[in-house]
Amino acid sequence: PKSNLPLKVIVLDDTQRNDDVNNPNSLGFGHGSLDQQRYDWLVQELELGQAEGKLMMIAAHIPIGVEPFPSMMGWHELAPVTEAQLIAKLHEYPNFILWAAGHRHINTVTAFKSPDPNRPELGFWQVETSSLRDFPQQLRVFELVRNSDATVSILATNVDPIVSEGSLAAKSRTNAVA
């Protein structure tokens, strides 16, 4: 890594807490959700990173904008901070470039285009990663590259760990959930 690319990684717990939603019909706590305290903290971190001129990424468990409620993969419809509010807020920071998430255990990339066509720098990317436990048992390496034209590229590389035949790791692949 080179130190001339200032990067702030914000690690965010965006999982539904047992006190986030006062709903006896909740299907558990697998949804995305932010209470006001976590949201305020996130906004403070984004403001600070923007003021410091740092590129910013968020590492969270639950992806955003993927599947509507009641799917267990998306944001809870009764979350104190709605998914739409969160995405709109993220679009306010030109230095915010990446939301990295797991939860669905799939490898996919989604563009969140700027709501203002005259300000494309307000858009960002979401990269979802697979699981080390479940099929396909991969990990992802992220590289941020400053290009010669002053743009930034995000490289997301899937890695298949090499495992010895007959090892516990190799056996686990035969038991991985597909």
What are these regions (language model features)?
Residues 1-52, 107-178:
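Metal-dependent phosphoesterase/phosphodiesterase active-site architecture
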Residues 19-39, 47-100:
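Active-site-proximal segments of metal-dependent phosphoesterases and phosphodiesterases across multiple
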Residues 103:
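Conserved active-site segments centered on acidic
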